[in-house]
Amino acid sequence: MSELNDLTTLPLPVRFERVARRDRRRRLVLVGSALVVALLVGAVGAWHPLLSAASRQSATIYGPSASSLDPAVQSDAGSAQVVSQLFESLTGIDSAARVQPALASSWDTTNGGKKVVFHLRSGLVFSDGSALKASDVVNSWMRVLSPTSPSQLASLLDGVVGARAYRDGSGPKSAVGIRATSDTDVEVDMSAAASDFPAIVSSPTLAVVPSGLDSNPKYLRAGSFVGSGAYVVSADNSSETTLTANKRYWAGTPAIDTIHLVSSPGANGIVDEFQAGNLDYTPISSGDATWIAYDKVLGPSLRLEPSPSIEYYGFNTTKAPFNDVHVRRAFAAGIDWSRVVALQSAPGVVSATGMVPAGVPNHGSGDFGPVFDLATAKSELAAAGFPGGSGFPAVTMITSGGDNGQLEGAIIHQLHDNLGIDITFRAEDWTTYNDQLLSNPPAFWEMDWVADYPGANDFLGLLLGTGQPNNFGRWSDATFDGAISEALSSTDAAAVQKAFDQAQSIVKDQAPVIPISYGSGYALAAKGLLGALPNSQGLVRYAGLSWASGS
């Protein structure tokens, strides 16, 4: 066992403060070892017709419990997996990253791309039989923008005229460019040409809820649940949520009538529970995937799917020492991040070449990842006033998730050996960690992000734009913002790519974050379970699941 793998032998003044870690992420994968929530059988997933029902009418799936069933409130992947089953968006994304109609049967783009009109399917109803109208869509999206309690993912609508000003409290609701022009038409005015807006509205955050939800919270409760998706909540407790097929679902009644979502893996762990036949589908860690791939019994049940996700480390750029670009550059260049990534030792995990994962439109061909260069790192550290690490202040790296601190240990080792810097490490539960990121970001932190929609801006502007809710390091750069604006407003493909490349170059130079790896998802699926095909958001729709005949 190498020194980096055995944290008990660290010859450094390293203090590991252990707090219970749980699987988490935003549109996120689980940490470190790239344990992937994105492969849970999710919603709005692979886009294909409903499959014929077989003799089996239920399935049991393991995954994190939802922190909220409200699309406008949820922001983590575990919640999105469940919410997407219960509430439908106007569009969906298939496994080839193509936008497909969902509640909207079609849409038109006019005024040079600045106006988008969505046409709802005729006869749409919620699960209780009440009519689903364009006004419900408008209400759902305005809830996301509410200035008193905006969604953590409200920035998805920033391209809409007046949307950002309204959620920031600096503009009136009446100025927001979202309106129902009839019971079936939703008209949206964009600040600039926005060819990606139909893809953006596929996000679970922008799913449609009944207009009376705020005054009738019972709509989110088991037994009285009212939704627009393929399933409704019929029972709920601390360890299991039961979903029942919505017989009024626009695409037809799902083939599997009952889905049991369990959030407690049992005393034996999820792999043993799956092997015992107690689970039909479960995500697994990359560590488990490496041995299961060679197991004669479990191997045939293993699923590996690319996931548009990135793991990155970031800094609080508003406070010393990381408000100094020289310090950030020293951390980026002073660590051999490829060695850190190699510790994950899992198929499908590769070093990042920038913030935009491979396979996402406008990923680009350039390499915008960190470059290991000790001479540069030492020079930058000296320029910041810390030659050889002398006088560097106390810093605690804080993360959350399910690994054992192996990656953090490697980072701490290299900072000590390469730059003479000693830092401490603490792991927190996801709720505490998320709250801290939003209110008082740690000096040095880690995040894994999975796309809300398949677009470069979901990994750039939404994560690093000035004032964005998910810009946890509070970084601000006018040139970066300008490049993003250019990318989003241009109708010329080459100009769009050039602008996104410029934005990535700025991130590489200024190092507000350090992209380290792109990940893949791993899961075990029972024999005969069909349709568990993730889309490019890492989600699979329960409505597309079925058991093969004879299962």
Where are the regions that the model predicts?
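Extracytoplasmic/peripheral linker and loop segments enriched in polar/acidic and small residues
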Residues: 16-21, 341, 422-438, 461-527, ...
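Ligand/substrate-recognition segments at binding pockets and active sites
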Residues: 23, 382-451
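N-terminal lobe/hinge region of extracytoplasmic solute-binding protein
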Residues: 62-111, 142, 224-227
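Long beta-strand-rich cores associated with HINT superfamily self-processing modules
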Residues: 523-551
